[in-house]
């Protein structure tokens, strides 16, 4: 078998790593060992933070909805409960956008949630009514 010299492949791999380390500070951008470690770590952070981004955005949407709903005189939890009882299925991202950009439509959603909560309050018997005398 012919002898295979690894210079070409090694150089290509090194170039690839150094290309990914562009913009890094200090030795991490131009020495292979430091660049490889930094690139590996950056990939781990990127993987982790792709998961965290979903949590962060959900929390942001909930905060925005909560602020808009409290202006209407309701809490976030009661609002979500009212929407589910009214049979309205809208995710939090869309609710957040509606609250920001379409205030009238959001007020209508809040009104329908309040209506569903009031209707159920009137029709559901109190569990403690018969027990306490």
Curated annotation (Swiss-Prot):
Biological function: Binds directly to 23S ribosomal RNA and is necessary for the in vitro assembly process of the 50S ribosomal subunit. It is not involved in the protein synthesizing functions of that subunit.
GO-annotated molecular function: rRNA binding; structural constituent of ribosome
Gene3D superfamilies recorded: 6.10.160.10, Ribosomal protein L20 (1.10.1900.20)
Protein name: Large ribosomal subunit protein bL20
PANTHER family: 39S RIBOSOMAL PROTEIN L20 (PTHR10986)
Top-level taxon of origin: Bacteria
One Gene Ontology cellular component annotation held by this UniProt entry: ribonucleoprotein complex
Pfam families: Ribosomal_L20
Keyword Ribosomal protein: yes
Keywords, comma-separated and alphabetical: Ribonucleoprotein, Ribosomal protein, RNA-binding, rRNA-binding
Entry's family note: Belongs to the bacterial ribosomal protein bL20 family.
One GO term of the biological process aspect: translation
CDD domains hit by this protein: Ribosomal_L20 (cd07026)
């Amino acid at each position: 078998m012919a002898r295979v010299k690894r210079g070409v492949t090694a150089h290509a791999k090194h170039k690839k790593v150094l290309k990914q380390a562009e913009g890094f500070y200090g030795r991490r951008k131009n020495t292979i060992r430091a660049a490889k470690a930094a690139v590996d770590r950056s990939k781990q952070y990127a993987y982790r933070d792709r998961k965290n981004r979903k949590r962060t955005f959900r929390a942001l949407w909930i905060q925005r909805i909560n602020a808009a709903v409290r202006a209407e005189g309701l809490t976030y939890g009661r609002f979500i409960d009212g929407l589910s009882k009214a049979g309205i299925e809208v995710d939090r991202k869309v609710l957040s956008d509606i609250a920001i950009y379409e205030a009238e439509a959001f007020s209508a959603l809040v009104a329908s949630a309040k209506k569903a909560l009031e209707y159920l309050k009137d029709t559901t018997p109190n569990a403690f009514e018969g027990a306490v005398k």
